[in-house]
Amino acid sequence: MARLARVELFDPSEIAAVHVMAKTVRHCWLLGLDERTGKNFDHRKLWIEDKLQALAANFGIDLLAFACMSNHFHLVLRSRPDVVGTWDDTEVARRWWTLCPKRKVIREVMGQEIFFPADPTEWELNSIRNDPVKLAQIRRRLSDVSWWMRLLCQYIAMRANKEEGTKVSGGLGHFWQGRYKAVRLLDEESLLACAAYVDLNPNRAAIAETIEDSQHTSVKRRVSALQTEVANNVSEDISPIDRSVDAPDCFLSPVSVDERNDPLGPRPSRSGKRCSDKGFIALADAEYLEILDWLARSTLSSKRGSTPEHAPKVFERLCIDPVVWAEMVKNFGRKFKSVAGNAKSIESARTRKSRRRYYCARV
């Protein structure tokens, strides 16, 4: 079945949660240990994490979850045009210059010469903010998931080719396998399932036994942030929004959203490390980690097809069947190709342009 055009799934002008995934070319292990050649490219996962931090600080897009594996990576993103709407023209110009600078400075990182954005001059900022057409185009790009993926994949590919001593047009050549895959998340149930699916990638691949053991994932950073707070005797009542700007998860969207008490509106980030301070699920951080821990241990101890036991009580509050939801997480990658959600959400959803129903595989 042909893959849907991006315009049929989501639009930068609307708030949308999306799961995206990109694979390295020819199933090569270009982000980890390649057993065939003996080369280890694990350090490239750090490149991805560093770039994610830069993108999260400048795009109008929330980074909800991520996982870097040896031949692919997963992200859960939420476009926030409402946050972009709160930025004045100067802020829009500054952010775009930081993402796509016309001038760069060279710094040495891990033995490599890396280009970083130079500080823009007033003239360079004026070239953007004094052009209404260009400014409107850039505002749209800042909440566009496709532009996020374009800059991320391009950066990693060019840096990897430079490391190999070649140019993008020759030598190592293409780094990524075609287009990135995208699945729109239609409801809270699918959003929680997708975040868990992404965070538990190392556990399903038998690379890690528990969530604490995983590396290069958003859950690892959330656990590290909580452990740091405990070690520093920080109050348990502290909000994830008020954590240190140096916390390991400072560039990630907060987990918890309180629909009753949280203020309305976009809630742009106060730290400048991420797009906004708005959470994405009605769970406390500890409850989310409890669910992931339950799933990870169930995956490790249960036989194929068996039902996980001792489900966290939070499922009752969310009105989610833990057995059905656990199966959704387990089969997420195979079941959902364009959109994800419960039966009612998928049945009522239509493609944006042609107004057709979405296809969902039976697993």
Give the residues covered by each predicted segment.
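Short catalytic/metal-binding and nucleic-acid-binding patches
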Residues: 1-363
